[in-house]
């Protein structure tokens, strides 16, 4: 295209035609139907002509860019601006978006709409004048989050965190893993605990020693500089999220469906999220459900089963707040400050939140890694200091030396034990929200296997810590594991008994056999042991037969048992004797039911098997109801109630001779500080004395 002096003042007709570089065109006859119509584009007086670095225009377009003789990248002088040329006809419009530099991954793009005669620059794209290739300025991403190279990440760690070159070189694989699997993306968020779980899996698969959650946060910020965090979720159940990063589409982690499902929830725009609900469709997992099921990998099969199991747990559970440590008038240990105690509070709370997230996703195998990472935390700097960042999302790190000192401090031991009671009670309510609701046997078995491994995992993770704190924490974990075993057994019994209670012929046979039992003889034998009110026993007998005759469902039987507990324990409400009365009721209930089963056995009752199953279920459910009533009366969690008495039982000489037991009782009665206190408080004082002697 040639420009003439006269062509600048008038409209110019331009014909599009093909040409060769060195030969004259060869003209051949072409049929009329195939002839190319000459296309003319007429540009009005607003067309700009650009030569070199100077832009000339005959329209009244205001200057939007500052000019410098040096080669540079021009940026908009302000936010979004629109400049229209004067005059009618075609229009040239330049759209400038708010960012002030060129993204390193973007090309400068201009799109032309010939029909509309508009030139519009795409969002985030900029017109660059001058020689960019020879410029000493490099494009930079002005978004608050942008990825760094491996060298830049190591340099940031050395500069900002004081990590030596040798230590930073050991983190190369960790940093490279972040670069390979995550990328920046606006409008999405990722929970910190979820990203840390991915990291723990990576370390487990590649036999690497993981860093704790706080140090891992520093690694992330060294790779994704300017990373922001937000606290998302409902009040009392909010969690910190990294805002502006997501899993790469081609990341190997996408092949693991349970992670992809969890990430799909988090990687939606914030206003579209639904907390902890598994996604119905996962990108990259296959479009055809039939083909996906036929060619599913073992990981996908396990993930699909995990997704199915999540409907049976309570993923909306609100994690209660932890109490503050009660230091009383005790002096702090040497070298420990209040800042260290506050850091421990924050660090332990986030550790427990990560545990909750892992259990909610049924990833039980990561609990061991979480415990190992927490109880083997390393100093944040060579001198062991732990400066807190100005950002509220910065994870504090307590060196192992200080953590061991704090674990010997009595108020911290009590505080950590109380926090564990809250944590494990929340986990029980998440995994088994309803002990009578039908649950798949695979989920029940997974929970029982999880309970079986807990004590060993914690003992191994805390092998270097003082025995006082290890014993205290293992005691709570043992109560947690025992509760899971009891509740899963109760659930299994409930499903077996449900079939019996729905069978009319079996119910009729049970009622017939029960009417043959000599309850007067049962009461006569049991009265000497239990000393129960005869009227109460007769009323329970009549109510039991009536409920059985009505062919009540399992839920109706559960309501009846609950009413029995309420009726029996009502006289003791508000009294310090409530826990003791509740335990005595369990013993008496079990003794009476065993006497009835004995009579049915001697009579060779046809429904003996059904009665035996029902008896096991009702005894276990009574235990469940009573422990919750005692917890409610004492203001504790059921885990705390069971843990307290299980610890007391483990410290009590159960297998001792009678003389030793009586000697222990006489010692207790002789203590003036204990003998004058109520039974419940007396037991707690005895427990505290035993704890201090350990």
Curated annotation (Swiss-Prot):
* GO BP terms in the entry: cilium assembly; neural tube closure; regulation of transcription by RNA polymerase II
Stretches with biased composition (Low complexity) = 300-310
What keywords are annotated for this sequence in UniProt?
Cilium biogenesis/degradation, Cytoplasm, DNA-binding, Nucleus, Transcription, Transcription regulation
**Region span, Disordered:** 267-310, 658-694
Q: Does the keyword Nucleus apply?
A: yes
Instruction: Name the domain of life.
Output: Eukaryota
Q: Quote the biased-composition stretches of kind Polar residues, using this chain's numbering.
A: 289-299
DNA-binding feature ranges = 174-249
Entry similarity comment: Belongs to the RFX family.
Function summary:
Transcription factor that acts as a key regulator of ciliogenesis. Specifically regulates expression of genes required for cilium assembly and function. Recognizes and binds the X-box, a regulatory motif with DNA sequence 5'-GTNRCC(0-3N)RGYAAC-3' present on promoters. Required for neural tube closure and neural ciliogenesis.
Whom does it interact with, and what assembly results? Homodimer. Heterodimer; heterodimerizes with other rfx proteins.
The name this protein goes by in its record: DNA-binding protein RFX2
Per the UniProt record, the source organism is Xenopus laevis
């Amino acid at each position: 295209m040639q420009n003439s002096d006269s062509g600048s003042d008038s409209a110019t007709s331009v014909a599009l035609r093909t040409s060769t570089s060195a030969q004259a065109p060869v003209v051949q006859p072409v049929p009329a139907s195939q002839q190319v119509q000459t296309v003319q584009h007429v540009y009005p007086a607003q067309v700009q002509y650009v030569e070199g670095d100077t832009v000339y225009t005959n329209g009244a377009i205001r200057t939007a860019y500052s000019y410098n003789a040096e080669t540079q990248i021009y940026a908009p002088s302000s936010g979004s601006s629109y400049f229209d040329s004067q005059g009618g006809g075609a229009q040239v419009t330049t759209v400038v978006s708010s960012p002030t530099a060129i993204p390193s991954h973007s090309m400068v793009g201009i799109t032309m709409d010939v029909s509309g005669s508009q030139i519009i620059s795409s969002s985030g794209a900029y017109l660059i004048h001058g020689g960019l290739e020879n410029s000493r300025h490099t494009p930079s991403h002005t978004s608050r989050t942008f990825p760094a190279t491996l060298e830049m990440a190591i340099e940031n760690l050395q500069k900002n965190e004081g990590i030596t070159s040798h230590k930073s070189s050991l983190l190369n694989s960790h940093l490279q893993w972040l670069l390979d699997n995550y990328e920046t993306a606006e409008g999405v968020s990722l929970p910190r605990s979820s990203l840390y779980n991915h990291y723990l899996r990576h370390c487990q698969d590649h036999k690497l020693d993981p860093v704790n959650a706080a140090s891992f946060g520093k690694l992330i910020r060294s790779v994704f500089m300017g990373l922001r965090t937000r606290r998302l979720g409902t009040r009392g159940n909010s969690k910190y999220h990294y805002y502006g990063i997501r899993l790469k589409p081609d990341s190997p982690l996408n092949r693991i469906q349970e992670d992809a499902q969890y990430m799909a929830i988090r990687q939606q725009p914030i206003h579209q999220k639904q907390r902890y609900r598994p996604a119905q469709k996962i990108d990259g997992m296959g479009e055809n459900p039939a083909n996906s099921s036929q060619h599913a990998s073992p990981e996908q099969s396990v993930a699909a089963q995990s997704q199915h199991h999540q409907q049976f747990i309570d993923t909306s559970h609100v994690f209660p707040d932890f109490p503050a440590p009660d230091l009383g008038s005790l002096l702090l240990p040497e070298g420990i400050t209040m800042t260290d105690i506050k850091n421990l509070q924050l660090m332990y709370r986030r550790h427990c939140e990560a545990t909750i997230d892992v259990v909610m996703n049924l990833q039980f195998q990561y609990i061991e890694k979480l415990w190992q990472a927490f109880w083997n935390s390393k100093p944040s700097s060579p001198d062991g200091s732990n400066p807190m960042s100005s950002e509220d999302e910065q994870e504090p790190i307590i060196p192992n030396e200080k953590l061991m000192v704090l674990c010997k401090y009595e108020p911290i031991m009590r505080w950590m034990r109380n926090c564990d009671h809250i944590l494990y009670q929340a986990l029980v309510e998440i995994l088994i929200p309803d002990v009578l609701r039908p649950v798949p046997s695979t989920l029940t078995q997974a929970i029982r296997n999880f309970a079986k491994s807990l004590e060993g995992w914690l003992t191994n993770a805390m092998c270097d810590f003082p025995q006082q704190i290890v014993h205290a924490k293992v005691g709570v974990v043992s109560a947690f594991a025992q509760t899971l075993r009891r509740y899963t057994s109760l659930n299994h019994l409930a499903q077996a008994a449900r079939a019996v209670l729905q069978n009319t012929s079996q119910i009729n046979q049970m009622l017939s056999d029960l009417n043959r039992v000599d309850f007067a003889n049962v009461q006569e034998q049991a009265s000497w042991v239990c000393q129960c009110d005869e009227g109460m026993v007769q009323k329970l007998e009549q109510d039991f037969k009536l409920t059985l005759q009505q062919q009540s469902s399992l839920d109706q039987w559960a309501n009846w048992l609950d009413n029995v507990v309420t009726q029996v324990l009502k006289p003791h409400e508000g009294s310090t004797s409530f826990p003791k009365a509740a335990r005595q009721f369990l013993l008496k209930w079990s003794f009476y039911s065993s006497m009835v089963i004995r009579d049915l056995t001697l009579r060779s009752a046809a429904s003996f098997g059904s009665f035996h199953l029902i008896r096991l279920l009702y005894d276990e459910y009574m235990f469940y109801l009573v422990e919750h009533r005692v917890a409610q009366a004492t203001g504790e969690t059921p885990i705390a109630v069971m843990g307290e008495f299980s610890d007391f039982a483990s410290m009590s000489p159960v297998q001792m001779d009678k003389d030793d037991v009586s000697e222990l009782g006489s010692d207790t009665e002789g203590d003036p500080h204990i003998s004058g206190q109520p039974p419940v408080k007396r037991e707690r004082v005895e427990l505290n004395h035993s704890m201090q002697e350990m």
